Amino acid sequence: MCIFAAMNENILPIHFAPLQGYTDAVYRRAHARIFGGIETYYSPFVRMEHGEIRRKDARDIEPDNNPDLHLIPQLIAPDADKLEHIMSLFIEKGYQEADINLGCPFPMLARRHNGCGMLPYPEEVKALLSEAIDRQPDVRSSVKLRLGWEHAEECLALQPLFNELPLAHIT
């Protein structure tokens, strides 16, 4: 029995957020075995580099590397074509869920309109998310969000969009 289940069966489910460079498949397996109690793990984001999906990222989400875990792979992309390419990998690996990262503040990525660097541009966010959902309607999409890149209220401009899209959730 996991330590959390013994505390209270009526508690909310726990979702394990990723930390780039730390919470890889080995960490997730060890955490699940030692602590348990996590309903869903999220992978660090999968991204494209030099026109290809990074091999390290693809290995990390391999189902064989994540046995007995409910893993939702996360991706980061500045446009719908790259996003679709990454989502196709998720589908190929058997995943039916994807988390789209609009929260990463890492300057090298954000300056290229990845992660929260896209938040000041609501039309780009709309194009990215709408295309993702239209192109992959069988994938349950969610969004990882930050308040903003330049201003905390940037996320508020996106609220109408989020309300009209069939997102599984926003974190």
Name each model feature, range by range:
Residues N8, L19-E92:
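Glycine-rich, positively charged N-terminal anion/phosphate-binding segment
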Residues I11-P13, G37-I38, P67-H70, D138-R140, ...:
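A generic structural signal for alpha->beta connector loops
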Residues I14-A17, Y41-S43, L71-L75, A98-I100, ...:
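Hydrophobic faces of well-ordered beta-strands that scaffold small-molecule active sites
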Residues A30, M87-A98, L102, F106-M108, ...:
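Alpha/beta enzyme core
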Residues R47-H50, A77-A80, G103-C116, T171:
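Conserved radical SAM core fold
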